[in-house]
Amino acid sequence: MASSASSLHFLSLTPQTLPLPKPTSQTTSLSFFSLPPSSLNLSLSSSSSCFSSRFVRKVTLSDFDQIEDVEDGDDGVEEERNFSPDLKIFVGNLPFSADSAALAELFERAGNVEMVEVIYDKLTGRSRGFGFVTMSSKEEVEAACQQFNGYELDGRALRVNSGPPPEKRENSSFRGGSRGGGSFDSSNRVYVGNLAWGVDQDALETLFSEQGKVVDAKVVYDRDSGRSRGFGFVTYSSAEEVNNAIESLDGVDLNGRAIRVSPAEARPPRRQF
């Protein structure tokens, strides 16, 4: 009887211990696959300020197994800072429906895409119509500019360029001087400071054109290095547009920096002797 009881007791334990690994495995699997969506949503969610939708290489909706490459938002920001400014491309005249993932898919035809940013309005949550693409090499940057400048995406011809084009800067400055007089009144001019190094005239004009008619937009560059000095000026056609721009855009996040927008101080005219 004792032997029989011992046998029965042993058999009763077996079905209890065998299923234990199964629920543990299922629980681990479920929690693993639930992590990537929440992590991705953190980088794509809107905030009270202007925000951007980012696509970072190796972090895609399907690559769940590579989510460990980016553990939190700080790592992604640090990786972005390490990218050379020469590898960043400005993409303007974007359709409002184009997000960072769509832009990344398009530019991957020209090479390896490291990161994509689409800039969104802080109040409406809608795209501002421009963004930035970071490639892996200068050759890929040139290929992307040649391939996609003027490329029609959802009915809109993209404006694609990289770096500060010297010819365009000179033309912009000359155009501003030639427009002197009432239409280029310095009282209708705003100063824009704390600009990210990758922001050029096109990005500045696209952003400020939402508040009125932009007569001139200029980013100031260093003569020796050709790099942005981190500030610029935008001229409107009326004082009302200037006030709208200051109220709406001062403190807005543009490419990772909160820009400063204020009335530009008028310079005394130069006298020729």
Swiss-Prot record:
Q: Where is the transit peptide?
A: 1-58
Which residues does the annotated region (Disordered) include? 156-181
| All copies of domain RRM, residue ranges | 87-165, 188-266
As one GO molecular function, the record gives: mRNA binding
Region span, Linker (Gly-rich) = 166-187
Classification via Gene3D superfamilies:
3.30.70.330
A Gene Ontology biological process in which this protein takes part is: chloroplast rRNA processing
Q: Which UniProt keywords apply?
A: Chloroplast, mRNA processing, Plastid, Repeat, Ribonucleoprotein, RNA-binding, Transit peptide
Top-level taxon? Eukaryota
Q: What is this protein called?
A: 29 kDa ribonucleoprotein A, chloroplastic
Q: Which organism is it from?
A: Nicotiana sylvestris
